[in-house]
From Swiss-Prot:
<feature type="domain" description="S4 RNA-binding">
    <location>
        <begin position="96"/>
        <end position="156"/>
    </location>
</feature>
<dbReference type="Pfam" id="PF01479">
    <property type="entry name" value="S4"/>
</dbReference>
<keyword id="KW-0689">Ribosomal protein</keyword>
<dbReference type="InterPro" id="IPR036986">
    <property type="entry name" value="S4_RNA-bd_sf"/>
</dbReference>
<protein>
    <recommendedName>
        <fullName>Small ribosomal subunit protein uS4</fullName>
    </recommendedName>
</protein>
<keyword id="KW-0687">Ribonucleoprotein</keyword>
<dbReference type="Pfam" id="PF00163">
    <property type="entry name" value="Ribosomal_S4"/>
</dbReference>
<comment type="subunit">
    <text>Part of the 30S ribosomal subunit. Contacts protein S5. The interaction surface between S4 and S5 is involved in control of translational fidelity.</text>
</comment>
<dbReference type="GO" id="GO:0019843">
    <property type="term" value="F:rRNA binding"/>
</dbReference>
<keyword id="KW-0694">RNA-binding</keyword>
<dbReference type="GO" id="GO:0003735">
    <property type="term" value="F:structural constituent of ribosome"/>
</dbReference>
<dbReference type="InterPro" id="IPR005709">
    <property type="entry name" value="Ribosomal_uS4_bac-type"/>
</dbReference>
<keyword id="KW-0699">rRNA-binding</keyword>
<dbReference type="InterPro" id="IPR018079">
    <property type="entry name" value="Ribosomal_uS4_CS"/>
</dbReference>
<dbReference type="GO" id="GO:0042274">
    <property type="term" value="P:ribosomal small subunit biogenesis"/>
</dbReference>
<dbReference type="InterPro" id="IPR002942">
    <property type="entry name" value="S4_RNA-bd"/>
</dbReference>
<dbReference type="InterPro" id="IPR001912">
    <property type="entry name" value="Ribosomal_uS4_N"/>
</dbReference>
Length: 206
């Protein structure tokens, strides 16, 4: 399955919430009718079944993190094997992806841009180049931008945007050095309250 390359705002409208797929610090609802689904009949909101509600939540989270269906299912299987709450485990596994950590540190304006930085070998973990977006970052790992990539205008622009956002407490970033430390795996309370991971657990438990 190929990645979605179409309009990003359309995906946010489909889910009825900002998926943070566009760069910038302003919420997108000022220019995008989030309450209306895309398409000719977008104004008509069908009443979702229990399954439909669970599916929409899974699609929403999958799109937020930019993960394909097969990858997402594998993350769920891994989360189910771990001790504790499966839904929380799932979100924590997604948060430890290298492309997501690069985004959280502000080196990429979006997760998609952060994924591209990783794929193009612009990112190092503990001094070694890593070009696998799904690479799992561990507590106390140091993530940095390669020296030859530090002049990229998009990275500088992303850092300027990130400076206006609320900084995640689980990462520590030195913007001047373009380097950050992943201090810990975030707790559930650190993450968006708009995600209902229990719906995803119910979906995959069927």
């Amino acid at each position: 399955m190929a990645r979605y390359l179409g309009p990003k705002l359309k995906l946010s409208r489909r889910e009825g919430t900002d998926l943070f797929l566009k760069s910038g610090v302003r919420a997108i609802d000022s220019k995008c009718k989030l309450e209306t689904a895309p398409g000719q009949h977008g104004a008509r909101k069908p009443r979702l079944s229990e399954y439909g509600t669970q599916l929409r939540e899974k699609q929403k989270v999958r799109r937020i993190y930019g993960v394909l269906e097969k990858q997402f299912r594998n993350y769920y299987k891994d989360a189910a094997r771990l001790k504790g709450n499966t839904g929380e485990n799932l979100l924590q596994l997604l948060e430890t992806r290298l492309d997501n950590v690069v985004y959280r540190m502000g080196f990429g304006a979006t997760r998609a841009e952060s994924r591209q930085l990783v794929s193009h070998k612009s990112v190092m973990v503990n001094g070694r180049v890593v070009n696998i977006p799904s690479f799992k970052v561990s507590a106390n790992d140091v993530v940095s931008i390669r020296e030859k990539s530090r002049t990229q205008a998009r990275i500088k622009a992303a850092l300027e945007v990130a400076a206006q956002r609320e900084k995640p407490t689980w990462v520590e970033v030195d913007s001047a050095k373009m380097e950050g430390a992943f201090k810990r795996v975030p707790e559930r309370s650190d993450l968006s309250a708009e995600i209902n991971e229990q719906l995803i657990v119910e979906l995959y438990s069927k």
